[in-house]
Regions:
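An N-terminal hydrophobic leader/cap segment in hydrolases
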Residues: 44, 55-112, 123
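The serine-hydrolase catalytic nucleophile loop
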Residues: 141-154
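Short alpha-helix in the alpha/beta-hydrolase fold that links the catalytic acid
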Residues: 151, 294, 308-317
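Conserved alpha/beta-hydrolase
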Residues: 155-175
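Alpha/beta-hydrolase active-site loop
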Residues: 179-200
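Hydrolase active-site cap/lid region
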Residues: 223-278
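Short beta-strand/loop motif that positions the catalytic acidic residue
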Residues: 292-293, 298-300, 304
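Acidic catalytic loop of the alpha/beta-hydrolase fold
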Residues: 303-307, 335
Length: 355
């Protein structure tokens, strides 16, 4: 009995030791599992941080690239020989007219010093029968005044207007380091209307001014239209302008790079505000048009996919005060309405200004 009891006790001790060993194994396994999970979580955390950091760096890099791509001026923007060559290629009959204007001293250059201290350039010429009627003509993105002399000829030769054709900031012979998409340009054009009034005011008829812009020049014109202006600025004509810098850049981001608006549009707009003092959303011709109370003529080609045709209806609808007119040029691509319909363009502008 004593032996059996002793043996039974040994068995119990043995079982207890085995249970302890099993429990130790379970504990070690659990501890190892916790260590493995901690390692995996730590690694996942590091990978997540790395991915976030890469995303942020890529977004910043993309924003810097997009801003430079969009707002850096043409490095050859002062090369007027190339500019005139392009003008004559598209409008061969312009060369004799330009040569005559230059030879006789009618086509002149002038400069204004802007509040920033930068000197801006413009071409100007008068019409003997103008009676104070003057057109301030605004060119497009990465273009210059000389390339739009076809429009200057229309106003001067066909409509009898004095003409002022500014080079926008960082375009043509105007100083500057960045393209302003028409936003800050609106205030520069306001200065040019003041110059035009001083230069061409008639002693009998006074002066009245139409501001006419194409593409980015049209966006500039619409942006100007919402400002407080002297009474002598009487009419506006916008040819294929965009609703806002945001909308136009979003269209090009998708068309050229197949990218959505988020996140680049948001970060690049913020960067633009930091670097240049304005944001893509702030540059909003459509909001300015909503404040315009003077007559405006809207022109757009229905085959325009650079500044999409649907934007015309949006800016037209936004103008709820004062007279307005619309002309859709059939089959016309971006900024080509005059080239496709020169006679009708001239007559429609004449009719609008006469109303």
């Amino acid at each position: 009995m004593i032996f059996r009891s002793f043996a039974l006790s040994l068995n119990k001790i043995s079982c207890t030791r085995k249970n302890i060993q099993v429990n130790l194994l379970i504990f070690r396994s659990f501890a190892l599992s916790l260590q493995t999970k901690a390692y995996i979580m730590k690694k996942t955390y590091r990978i997540t941080l790395a991915v976030i950091a890469l995303f942020i760096l890529a977004t910043i890099g993309g924003s810097v690239y997009m801003l430079n791509f969009s707002l850096s001026p043409d490095p050859n923007h002062t090369d007027l020989d190339s500019t005139y060559a392009i003008l004559y290629k598209h409008f061969p009959d312009m060369k004799p007219w330009v040569d005559s204007m230059q030879t006789n001293g009618y086509l002149r250059d002038t400069f204004l010093t802007m509040p920033t201290g930068e000197r801006h350039h413009a071409l100007y010429f008068r019409a003997d029968s103008a009676k104070g009627r003057t057109a301030v003509l605004v060119h497009g993105y990465k273009d210059c005044a000389a390339k739009f002399l076809y429009l200057g000829r229309m106003y001067n030769r066909d409509l009898g207007y004095n003409v002022v054709m500014p080079d926008l900031h960082a375009h043509g012979l105007s100083e500057g380091n960045d393209i302003q998409m028409g936003w800050k340009d609106r205030l520069d054009i306001k200065r040019w209307t003041e110059m035009a009034a001083e230069t061409f005011r008639d002693s009998v008829y006074g002066v009245n001014i139409v501001v006419h812009g194409v593409s980015m020049g049209a966006a500039t014109t619409m942006s100007l239209s919402g400002e407080e202006l002297p009474a002598y600025v009487t009419h506006f004509i916008e040819d294929c302008g965009y609703t806002s810098a945001w909308d136009e850049f979003a269209v090009q981001l998708k068309a050229q790079f197949s990218l959505p608006q988020f996140p680049l549009m948001y970060t690049t707009s913020l960067l633009c505000r930091i670097v240049h003092g304005w944001s893509f959303g702030e540059c909003s011709p459509i909001k300015q048009v909503a404040k315009c109370q003077r007559p405006m003529f809207f022109i757009h080609g229905d085959a325009d996919d650079f500044v999409p045709f649907y934007m015309m209806q949006q800016v037209y609808d936004a103008k709820t005060h004062g007279k307005k007119a619309m002309w859709v040029t059939k089959g016309t691509t971006h900024a080509s309405s005059y080239a496709d319909y020169p006679k009708e363009y001239t007559e429609r502008v004449r009719q609008f200004l006469a109303e």
